[in-house]
Amino acid sequence: SSRGLGDVYKRQPFAIALTIFSFFQVGFNIEDFKRNWENRKLVTDTLFNPKWEWAIENASQALLETIQIAILASILGCFIALPLSFYASRATNQTTVTYLIYKSFLNFIRTIPDLFWAMLFTVAVGLGPFAGVLALVMFSMAIMGKLLSETIDSIDLGPLEAAKASGARHNQAVFTSALPQILPNFTAYFLYIFELCIRASVILGLVGAGGVGRIIETQRIFLRFDRISPIIVLILVAVIAIEQFSVWLRRKIL
């Protein structure tokens, strides 16, 4: 409508001013941009001249390690989050104190970035894939806890109340009536989180948490983009293959 367009036009000066202010706040300088843009030749000349033999020989094992980190972390994180989610849902936890404790715990974990967890665990247990697994366990647990607790909030409470009326204890009623309702969602969330962990495990390697990211960071330091580019392609192929497998498995199960 004309009124809607008028409101948009009125807000344009504010949006432009906010954009300009943001440029200054992040330290954007057109002269620095032009000067640094000249360095692109160093990147493009090597980036598009990939060393495939080197990448396959040196990065294949690390890529497999990345996938293994994601598998282990997503399994552990999601299954730890499963019981926690019931305690963090009003539908299955009627005790306000414990509900707030578990809900706050999951919120706290979710607010901390996975990179921080990786840096924390590399200090605690040392560099390597074990630190990456622990970091992604926290990452997976936080996401699954949020998604699943919100799903539990919307379940049909009829079977739960019927189980309690027939004499079942609260935990028994939850196990027999609430759990079956959320298992399809749990499976879908697990596959989604596994895909996220594949991508995240690559990034965590940049801070020494194992996987192929460690090799990428080492080659970046030496400006060997000719070795980085084929590794990125290998990661892309692996991610696409895993996503397709995930879609196929989701259709079969759900």
Question: What does each model-identified segment do?
Answer:
Residues 3-9:
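Short, small-residue-biased leader/transition segments that mark boundaries at the very start
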Residues 28-73:
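Periplasmic/extracellular loop-to-transmembrane helix junction in inner-membrane transport proteins
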Residues 27, 79-86, 116, 131, ...:
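Membrane-embedded alpha-helices of multi-pass transport/permease systems
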Residues 84-118, 147-150:
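Cytoplasmic-entry segments and transmembrane alpha-helices of multi-pass inner-membrane transporters
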Residues 170-204, 226-235, 242:
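Transmembrane alpha-helices
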Residues 155-182, 209:
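Short helix-to-coil transition segments within interhelical loops
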Residues 123, 199-235, 254:
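Glycine-rich helix-loop "coupling/hinge" segments at transmembrane-helix boundaries
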Residues 106-140:
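Generic hydrophobic transmembrane alpha-helix motif, especially the helices
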